[in-house]
Amino acid sequence: MASNDKGLEEIPEGQIESNYDEITDSFDAMNLRAELLRGVYAYGFERPSAIQQRAIMPVIKGSDVIAQAQSGTGKTATFSISALQKVDTNLKACQALILAPTRELAQQIQKVVVAIGDFMSIECHACIGGISVREDMKALQDGPQVVVGTPGRVHDMIQRRVLKTDHMKMFVLDEADEMLSHGFTEQIYDIFQFLPQSTQVVLLSATMPQDVLEVTTKFMRDPVRILVKKAELTLEGIKQFYIAVEKEEWKLDTLSDLYETVTITQAVIFCNTRRKVDWLTDKLTARDFTVSAMHGDMEQQQRDVIMKEFRSGSSRVLIATDLLARGIDVQQVSLVINYDLPANRENYIHRIGRGGRFGRKGVAINFVTADDNGRTRKAKRKKGI
């Protein structure tokens, strides 16, 4: 961890330049501990994805690493495998801390760590809001080797001196662009101050806005930079369609027509506000369409139930805000509908990335009103569409 690295100041905002091109194209060649390798294969991996081929080895070797890669490329397993390789299973203390922007993503990462580490004596705790502070404190006092959490709760537990950082080897920031854009900057900077100087920093982000680049210059030492190129991202496998809807009020009928004509395995419909999610859910339900909805105003328990139903397939259409656009991995999502176009291009990447996880094919349909046209042209230019 560094405080004044200047190596990235010349990098243009938006995309980093790779400075590392070594590829390890099989898990067997990574010299992973036997019980970890067994867990990797038991989880269902056969060969590493593009980011796993490039990033796992430098992380295991101890380098600070910046990886620019989108959700759906296998990055969760990248840092999970690396962390599990590095921790001392005999030491009951937090050695790897992983931050994520939402509770759902933190819980998902925890499940991946636990599953891949199934044959190791490893504990992984999800340190998130929505569960009682007392429960959190008890779990942390047991000394889990890996802690996954959201910035607010992790910061609180460190300040209470319940989450001890003395033995910390690795600090991972997943979806760094999202965390920093949602007002977690101060808490994240504070967390850095509590970590030992020797802590390895791994940062993952789909986009590289200025606030992310500032973190890399302040806290990382000569980082290995890995860019998984756009051609290797999940957008490549996603067909994008634009439907011109002259007026906002015509969107509902357009969606109803689509619903009746398109065969959907599972779909996510994105709206820009929580109020719109509730309104659209009510309107579609009144038309006898079966849908479920999720947004940040809901209790954590309710959100967990909805996600469980959606993952299991008992619910096939989910209406959501951007809360869901980051990192929620539902394997069968084949269609994403932007009922409202997102406010920025970063969220567009994350939203439609739901429909092509790990390189699978998917479809994104965007409803475009006259007011949206200028933004659409701009987004298309930036995406090379």
Swiss-Prot record:
Protein name: ATP-dependent RNA helicase eIF4A
Catalysed reactions, semicolon-separated: ATP + H2O = ADP + phosphate + H(+)
Major subcellular location class: cytoplasm
Molecular functions per Gene Ontology: ATP binding; ATP hydrolysis activity; RNA binding; RNA helicase activity; translation initiation factor activity
Residue positions binding ATP: 69-76
The EC number(s) this enzyme carries: 3.6.4.13
Domain text: The Q motif is unique to and characteristic of the DEAD box family of RNA helicases and controls ATP binding and hydrolysis.
Annotated organism of origin: Ajellomyces capsulatus (strain NAm1 / WU24)
Motif (DEAD box): 174-177
Motif Q motif per UniProt: ranges: 25-53
SUBUNIT field: Component of the eIF4F complex, which composition varies with external and internal environmental conditions. It is composed of at least eIF4A, eIF4E and eIF4G.
SMART domains according to UniProt: DEXDc, HELICc
Family matches, as Gene3D superfamilies: P-loop containing nucleotide triphosphate hydrolases
UniProt keyword ATP-binding, yes or no: yes
InterPro entries tied to this protein: DEAD/DEAH_box_helicase_dom, EIF4A_DEADc, Helicase_ATP-bd, Helicase_C-like, P-loop_NTPase, RNA-helicase_DEAD-box_CS, RNA_helicase_DEAD_Q_motif
Origin superkingdom: Eukaryota
Listed Pfam families: DEAD, Helicase_C
